[in-house]
Amino acid sequence: GGRIDVNIVTGGDEIEQRRFGDRVDHDRRYARTAEFLEVVTRLWDGETVDFAGEFYTIDGAFIPEPPQPRPTVFFGGSSDPALSVAADHAEVYLTWGEPPQVAGTKITEVARRAETRGRTLEYGVRLHVISRETSAEAWRVADRLLAGISDDEIAAAFALHSASGST
């Protein structure tokens, strides 16, 4: 990219979405994101856009001076609709720092889908990093952050994330 890149986030869990007036369900949010990316990337490419979709109707939209170079689209998600949006529209597919086999399976599937569309993506991993002068100091901070969190609380947090629709 150039001076700006964008990380597209389709949304979080259903309750969070409703707080902001968004009542579109998980899969339809990804359909809406696909439409948005179809329109915005065509605009960035300098096209005058006419578009009629389920969520957007655009008549003759254009950007007088499209960004140069075009912003790079970063996109992540683990659900089937997310993988399809990534394959169709992202330049960089992002995944969490999951076990290598889990991340590898997702990346392989996104790459396969992108290839069927004549596209090749780049890949990134999102991690939380604790940086200190020494490894021992970093581990002390990590241990302090994790102190007092039970295995049950960790399991509950994973279950909540899994049920959230943020995939």
Each language-model region and where it sits:
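Short connector loops/turns at beta-strand edges and beta->alpha or beta->beta junctions
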Residues: 11-14, 79-80
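Short, acidic/polar
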Residues: 75-85
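Hydrophobic faces of well-ordered beta-strands that scaffold small-molecule active sites
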Residues: 4-8, 73-76, 91-95, 121-127
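Acidic (Asp/Glu)-rich catalytic clusters
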Residues: 1-3, 87-88, 112-118
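An alpha-helical appendage that flanks or caps ligand/catalytic pockets
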Residues: 13-14, 20-69, 98-167
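Short, surface-exposed connector motifs at secondary-structure boundaries
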Residues: 65, 87-93
